[in-house]
A protein has these predicted regions:
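Cell-envelope/extracellular polymer assembly enzymes that use nucleotide-activated donors
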Residues: 2-4, 32
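Conserved donor NDP-sugar-binding/catalytic core segment of glycosyltransferases
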Residues: 108-139
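Acidic donor-binding segment of Leloir-type glycosyltransferases
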Residues: 22-72
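Short aromatic/hydrophobic "clamp" motif used to bind/position activated sugar donors
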Residues: 96
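The conserved acidic donor/metal-binding loop of glycosyltransferases
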Residues: 100-104
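Short, flexible, basic/aromatic active-site loop/helix in glycosyltransferases
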Residues: 142-149
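Glycine-rich, basic loop-to-helix element that forms the pyrophosphate-binding segment
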Residues: 74-91
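Short, well-formed alpha-helical segments that are part of the catalytic scaffolds
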Residues: 12-25
Length: 149
């Protein structure tokens, strides 16, 4: 079964690089990673005007990781549900995993554990997001409140 990972991104940085590294190290192969970048109007204009788009982190990552597909939406068109739905429509996989750009897999078995229940009669599987080790107190509280053990 093919598995795609869908990640909306906004002003991506090193967190996204770390996430991609961990996704490519998973025990279950990922068919493709669909990134949907939200762009401010000025960012979209400057990217279109650049003669060398090589400076874009996402374009660099797409070259480094061959299974990445890039899409973009304008900031004013971004909607949590509709943006993800658009990405799902770009997927041809049997299973898709939705992630956020700041959620790092704690181990190499995240995709395996998330998708294993879907091989049977289960339609949805989910995981909790742990706080980062060096996070602020508010992030630690929010993660523990939203995703209790």
């Amino acid at each position: 079964m093919d598995i795609d990972v869908i990640i909306p991104v906004y002003r991506p940085g090193e967190d996204l690089v770390a996430l991609l590294n961990r996704l490519y190290a998973q025990t279950v192969e990922i068919h493709k990673i669909i990134l949907v970048e939200t762009l401010d109007e000025e960012e979209k204009t400057s990217m279109e005007e650049e003669t060398s788009a090589e400076n874009s982190l996402l374009l660099h990552l797409q070259k480094q990781y061959k299974k990445i597909e890039l899409y973009s939406v304008k900031k004013e068109d971004f909607d949590h549900g509709m943006t993800r739905r658009m990405a799902v429509e770009k997927s041809d996989a049997d299973i898709f995993v939705m992630m956020t750009q700041d959620a790092l897999p704690a181990d190499r078995k995240l995709i395996e554990k998330l998708t294993a229940p879907l091989m049977g009669d289960i339609a949805v599987s989910y995981a909790r997001q742990l706080p980062r080790k060096n996070c602020r107190a508010i992030e630690r509280f929010t993660r523990r409140f939203n995703y209790p053990e």
